[in-house]
Swiss-Prot record:
It catalyses: NAD(+) + (deoxyribonucleotide)n-3'-hydroxyl + 5'-phospho-(deoxyribonucleotide)m = (deoxyribonucleotide)n+m + AMP + beta-nicotinamide D-nucleotide. Zn(2+) binds at residues 408, 411, 426, 432. NAD(+) binds at residues 32-36, 81-82, 113, 136, 173, 290, 314. Its cofactor is Mg(2+); Mn(2+). HAMAP family: DNA_ligase_A. The active site is at 115 (n6-amp-lysine intermediate). One of its GO terms (biological process) is DNA repair. This is DNA ligase. Belongs to the NAD-dependent DNA ligase family. LigA subfamily. Residues 593-671 form the BRCT domain. Its EC number is 6.5.1.2. It is an enzyme of class 6 (ligase). One of its GO terms (molecular function) is metal ion binding. It comes from Escherichia coli O9:H4 (strain HS).
Amino acid sequence: MESIEQQLTELRTTLRHHEYLYHVMDAPEIPDAEYDRLMRELRELETKHPELITPDSPTQRVGAAPLAAFSQIRHEVPMLSLDNVFDEESFLAFNKRVQDRLKSNEKVTWCCELKLDGLAVSILYENGVLVSAATRGDGTTGEDITSNVRTIRAIPLKLHGENIPARLEVRGEVFLPQAGFEKINEDARRTGGKVFANPRNAAAGSLRQLDPRITAKRPLTFFCYGVGVLEGGELPDTHLGRLLQFKQWGLPVSDRVTLCESAEEVLAFYHKVEEDRPTLGFDIDGVVIKVNSLAQQEQLGFVARAPRWAVAFKFPAQEQMTFVRDVEFQVGRTGAITPVARLEPVHVAGVLVSNATLHNADEIERLGLRIGDKVVIRRAGDVIPQVVNVVLSERPEDTREVVFPTHCPVCGSDVERVEGEAVARCTGGLICGAQRKESLKHFVSRRAMDVDGMGDKIIDQLVEKEYVHTPADLFKLTAGKLTGLERMGPKSAQNVVNALEKAKETTFARFLYALGIREVGEATAAGLAAYFGTLEALEAASIEELQKVPDVGIVVASHVHNFFAEESNRNVISELLAEGVHWPAPIVINAEEIDSPFAGKTVVLTGSLSQMSRDDAKARLVELGAKVAGSVSKKTDLVIAGEAAGSKLAKAQELGIEVIDEAEMLRLLGS
């Protein structure tokens, strides 16, 4: 049996190894939750055996050494980390410790914030001008990232307003919105560049570039959450007051900062944020809870590496480790072959996960994945679980190579990969049962034809029994035929028939989207419908004419043109119309006759809106003569940026396109 000294040595060595991978290499091998567990184990052992604590133990410092490639900045006020709690019981124990330690009977008010999952930085302003910026580093010394931070548009180069201190060091988090992260990885996959495991790694990798021009191209943003150095000026005597003051001076502060009067209110805040987490547009891994009063903060003081007056209340881990038992290949509605890892089931963020996407052959090669490997699985919000990385240091001896199929696993047709594309596809078309199933599921989906009650299992049975081959066949179904399906009684069957009848009345945009043309999403379908007005005009359009539509380039135009050039597709459309599918005649909106600031403009919406849904905003803009596109290009006239706007906002700024916020949009809509 190992001695206590040996256990401590092994834990410290393991933690230092993972700190190096995380802080220096930007290539973490294990999830945060596993690191936290190891750190807790070490801290518990050291608490029981304080005589064995060493000065270089990971519990005695904040992080790891800075990268040698950057010059170093010594923090005048150390950048400490926070202690963590992981459940309500631990938070309530922290709350009690704070109450017990305060000598007075003053009420404690809590300032609660989001715990952003990015990179902690300090930014020094002298007489209101940004003069330097640094990473946390080891808490005492960080990396000089001034040139890179100056490229982040959310961070003001000069503060504005009155009573700005002579020297003010603000602290906060640089992070990457989800949309920006997806765009970076999409571009990387297309060009063979580095694909990041998660937005935090992408933010760190973007900020720690030796070439600031690369950082400038990444849609990084920033929220301020604290202060370090303060000279030649005063700040409010509460934490919230300071954040509001920073906001007045032009520093970005999260609008989710909330003052809580009791532990019960803090817990309610925690659960509300946890509920809202999937819709924020950026990654968080918990909430930060701070004593609001600066006087009480001073009274509570610090321990070696963290303040006694604050704690991070972390959410259940979104990353966990497990083993890949097999890799299978699924076929999508456009024939795309997607490898899926079959996993040893593991709970991730409160959900039992047994499958994870591997995207494509390039991703398997990038990961270096073999069947039998130990891997890190990530699940964020509604995102499909994915394999983040392989734990190479724990690779079993009996792993097997993943062999990508040369023939479709469903219909046996050849698999081809077009040059320049990452995705391999089955060439079987609608003779492939898998493609037929997925096409029909898309056709009846809520955002397409919206056939209520026709779920995936019904479609699977209809295809397997060969009752349905094309979307038009759906409208020929009878209650009698449906009653023969598994778990389908006469009443349920009649409900489905009624839903199909109701779905015949649709819109031109929904109909186009339901057809499942490659690269034609909802926004593009709406743009095509608005521009051409009728099916006949769209079918007759040339590739050149199609490219006049906002959001349509040569690739999309070619897909649309080729779809309508295919006789079998035209036949299906004719059958659908013969079965009674219809939509209202187009209402021609002449932008020149509309007195509106949006008339005739191509507008792009990005980020989340708080006062109306995206669909309502789009409809209102179209009524006022705007063309609403799904992506930013040189054709775009205006971008409306909501909360947590990502890569579209960054591209608009890069192209010099006018940008307004939601408040200005609402003002113009009402004018």
